[in-house]
A protein has these predicted regions:
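Membrane-interface "cap" regions at the ends of multi-pass membrane proteins
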Residues: 1-65, 201-206, 218, 225-235, ...
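C-terminal membrane-solvent junction of multi-pass transporters and transport-like membrane proteins
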Residues: 23, 197, 344-405, 409-420
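Hydrophobic, membrane-embedded alpha-helices of multi-pass small-molecule transporters
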Residues: 27-46, 186-257, 266-287, 367-379
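Transmembrane alpha-helical segments of multi-pass small-molecule transport proteins
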Residues: 38, 114-118, 139-162, 176-183, ...
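Extracellular loop-to-transmembrane helix junctions
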Residues: 51-88, 102, 109-111, 241-242
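Membrane-water interface regions at transmembrane-helix termini and the short interhelical loops
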Residues: 88, 131-139, 153-174, 192-195, ...
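Hydrophobic transmembrane alpha-helices that form the core helical bundles
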Residues: 109-141, 282-299
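Membrane-interface loop-to-helix entry segments
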Residues: 147-188, 197, 234-241, 333-345, ...
Length: 420
């Protein structure tokens, strides 16, 4: 039987080994800006820019560069606001994201989104390792892809064992290099010769950019709970993630309009150096997914040691990355949006309707099965809206309105007002 009990007390400046230990509050505004800024820049973001530019698929007419950039700004701004709002809740309560859902659904009910989030995070972690491995194969073509995948998976797992320590490294060193590399590519990548394309598919492009941002909502509180203040958590998430994702997509859109994204980067002078900086930075995305998968599992098993869980998750994502390819990435993004956009609407609306009353985040939190109804309605709305409408916005509004309606019914409030 797997022994997941802690062997020694957690260090006071690092994430506790279990959910039963005190939560250190060591991250300031610069730490949060560094973390979320780095999460906003991704090799997958460059791939996502292709999906924004071609919302109808590679064989459909593309958006114009202006339309694609505007879709990126709108989707990113909405998604960053959702991240910031969830981060504020995490900083205020000291609870990770899936534990917050105990207040929304009760302990048993929170298992449903927790399992879905574990699946999502395993998917993201796998895609990140695949992306890094594929990128390194282009830079050093003589090394087999599987070698890079195993190496990246190993480093990812090691970083996930000391997440707060790695956040401090991001803030002090990596963020500066990333900004310089991104700025250089933005100036060096040649602009496309023409502005072909239109506005057809604009709402789908918004949903694609929004889905990438919203995919981070289920992990926002995992780091925000370590913030010294609510302001640092919310502002760091909104500004750091929003500005850097838009910048990342802008570079990707220009490159995608000119040809293969990675090939365009490598063709410019010093492009290999800038590209390698971004490849190395990608490790923060992969380790963040491994860590948040671990914390999500701890919502179901609070006493399990996160070090053991992170090791297991790292091995699983690395194993999957040996066989997974990027063909279904765009579909994966839209599926994520259909689940987590309405969940965010339910979460934030429920908090507002409670008028500041505390959620019951304890291991005995009572079930609130009615709150699953607005979430289900939001998911249905996402898949039923016509193609010209924004599925993300409609599903969020439907879920939020249904949550507000549920609050006029009896027994929708948590039976206790305590925070973990």
């Amino acid at each position: 039987m797997l022994d997941v009990s802690p062997r020694a007390p957690s260090p006071v400046d690092e994430v506790p080994h279990t959910l039963d230990e005190p939560v250190p509050r060591t991250l300031g505004l610069l730490d949060q800006l560094g973390l979320w800024g780095n999460l906003g820049v991704s090799l997958l973001g460059f791939t996502g820019a292709v999906a924004v530019l071609h919302p109808g698929g590679p064989d459909a007419p593309p958006l114009s560069l202006l339309a694609a950039l505007l879709a990126t700004v709108v989707g990113t701004a909405l998604g960053s606001a959702a991240i910031a709002a969830t981060a504020a809740l995490g900083a205020r309560t000291g609870a990770p994201s899936m534990v917050l859902l105990r207040g929304l659904f009760g302990v048993r009910g929170s298992a449903v989104p927790t399992v879905l989030n574990v699946v999502q995070m395993l998917g993201w972690g796998t895609f990140e390792i695949v992306t890094i491995g594929s990128a390194l194969t282009q830079v050093v073509p003589g090394v087999p892809r599987w070698t890079w995948v195993v190496a990246v998976g190993t480093v990812t797992t090691l970083l996930a064992l000391r997440p707060l320590g790695w956040v401090r490294v991001l803030r002090r060193y990596v963020s500066v290099l990333v900004v310089l590399a991104l700025g250089y590519l933005l100036l060096a990548v040649p602009a496309p010769a023409s502005s072909a394309g239109g506005w057809s598919g604009f709402s789908t492009a918004v949903d694609t950019a929004l889905a990438v941002a919203v995919s981070w909502v289920p992990m926002a509180a995992d780091y925000a709970r370590h913030s010294r203040s609510t302001r640092a958590a919310a502002l760091g998430a909104f500004v750091g993630y929003g500005v850097l994702q838009v910048s990342c997509y802008a570079v990707g859109l220009v490159a995608a309009a000119s040809g293969d994204v990675f090939a365009v980067f490598l063709a410019v002078p010093l492009g290999v150096v800038a590209f390698l900086v971004l490849v190395g930075r990608e490790l923060d995305q992969s380790f963040a997914n491994v860590y948040s998968t671990t914390v999500s599992v701890q919502n179901l098993r609070p006493h399990w040691d996160r070090r053991v869980l992170s090791t297991v998750v790292g091995v699983v994502t690395t194993g999957l990355a040996l066989f997974v390819h990027m063909d279904d990435y765009a579909g994966f993004l839209l599926l994520i949006g259909s689940v987590f956009v309405p969940l965010t609407g339910v979460l934030l609306t429920d908090r507002v309707c409670l008028r500041g009353a505390g959620w019951d985040l304890s291991p005995t939190a009572a079930a609130r099965p009615l709150m699953l109804l607005p979430w289900a309605l939001g998911i249905a709305a996402y898949h039923l809206v016509p193609a010209w409408a924004s599925a993300s916005l409609v599903s969020f509004l439907v879920a939020a309105a249904a949550t507000a309606a549920v609050h006029v019914l009896p027994q929708t409030r948590p039976t206790q007002e305590v925070s973990r």
